[in-house]
Amino acid sequence: MPKLKTKSGAKKRFKVTGTGKVVSAHAGKRHGMIKRTKKQIRQLRGTRILFKTDGENIKKYFLPNA
């Protein structure tokens, strides 16, 4: 059976850490931030660690070679 290909959209959005956790950027920073407080905008910086089950699904179906 041939090797599964990595989904190119997932490759751009998710990274797998050395310990196997999946991280991604926070959503909600493209537009409409005039409504948000400075604190809300600040908290959307950086990356977040996905929940364990979500991370397992991402690795299984979208990043099989990670």
From Swiss-Prot:
Cystines in this chain: none
BP terms from Gene Ontology: translation
Gene Ontology, cellular component aspect: cytosolic large ribosomal subunit
InterPro entries (UniProt xref): Ribosomal_bL35 (IPR001706), Ribosomal_bL35-like (IPR021137), Ribosomal_bL35_CS (IPR018265), Ribosomal_bL35_sf (IPR037229)
PROSITE patterns: RIBOSOMAL_L35
Single annotated GO MF: structural constituent of ribosome
Keyword set, alphabetical order: Ribonucleoprotein, Ribosomal protein
Keyword Ribonucleoprotein appears in the UniProt entry: yes
Family to which the UniProt record says this protein belongs: Belongs to the bacterial ribosomal protein bL35 family.
Name the record gives this protein: Large ribosomal subunit protein bL35
